[in-house]
Design a protein with these regions (language model features):
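Nucleotide and nucleotide-moiety/phosphate-recognizing core
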Residues: 9-178, 183-201, 208-209, 215-221
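Short Lys/Arg-rich cationic patches that frequently serve as NLS/NoLS or arginine-rich RNA/DNA-binding motifs
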Residues: 1-9, 222-227
Length: 227
């Protein structure tokens, strides 16, 4: 079992979280065209819905994307990339980095800009119906001894992470070639949240058909005609 990260911060609080939206996925199943996070859902890009729902739940917010397209800059939040040394290593190996690199980028950004925060909350850019009480529910998992990771069960990128894990995460990616989020999380103290009522709020949009279904869900119900 890996050595557990030492915690120097106080208990995680919703107001002390830095939000990190992971917008680096290629979205190949969506087909050619606009990158998946920028596909329109209603009249706005999918990622804009995630930012809107996550912003009130955190103290600050950043989007991780290696290509800062104008559609992302229009969100008016900081756009950061995966750490450069990780990108170079991935090119040498001919492998994709995956979401762990984005999580590390968020941790390192939070440590530079909010050194007393201690925690980040990650969310993928393709979950536009993100619950408005996600932070409160995840922080409710805190107990003694404190977990290092608070995660929604079966939704591994929806999680609260201690930034103290950054050094170990960097080693795991660079030295071990680790890519699976759950594998890294289970090395540390992990608490999982079984979302009440199932996973409906965490609809991941990966295909044009799922995007169409999400658009129908987003549309306001039409009033029934009277006869």
């Amino acid at each position: 079992m890996a050595t557990k990260a030492k915690q120097d911060f106080g208990p995680v609080r919703a107001a002390a979280l830095v939000g990190v939206v992971l917008a680096g996925g290629e979205g190949r199943r969506m087909g050619p065209g606009v990158l998946k996070p920028l596909r329109l859902l209603g009249d706005r890009p999918m990622v804009a819905h995630v930012v809107e729902r996550l912003r009130p739940q955190v103290m600050d917010l950043v989007v991780v994307a290696n290509d800062p397209l104008p559609g992302l800059r229009a969100l008016k939040v900081p756009i950061i990339a995966d750490p450069p040394d990780l990108q170079r290593a991935a090119r040498r190996e001919g492998r994709r980095l995956g979401p762990l690199a984005g999580i590390l980028a968020g941790m390192e950004w939070a440590r530079r800009h909010h050194p007393h925060a201690g925690w980040i909350l990650t969310a993928p850019a393709d979950v536009p119906f993100l619950p408005l009480d996600l932070t409160v529910r995840l922080c409710g998992l805190m107990h003694v001894p404190e977990p290092d990771v608070l995660m929604v069960r079966r939704e591994h990128t929806l999680a609260v992470w201690s930034v103290k894990l950054a050094a170990d995460l960097r080693r795991a990616i660079l030295q071990e070639g680790m890519r699976r989020v759950e594998e890294f999380a289970r090395r540390h103290r992990l608490a999982e949240l079984a979302w009440p009522g199932g996973g409906a709020p965490f609809l991941n949009i990966n295909t044009p058909e799922e995007l169409s279904a999400a658009s129908r869900r987003l549309a306001p119900a039409r009033p029934r005609s009277r006869r």
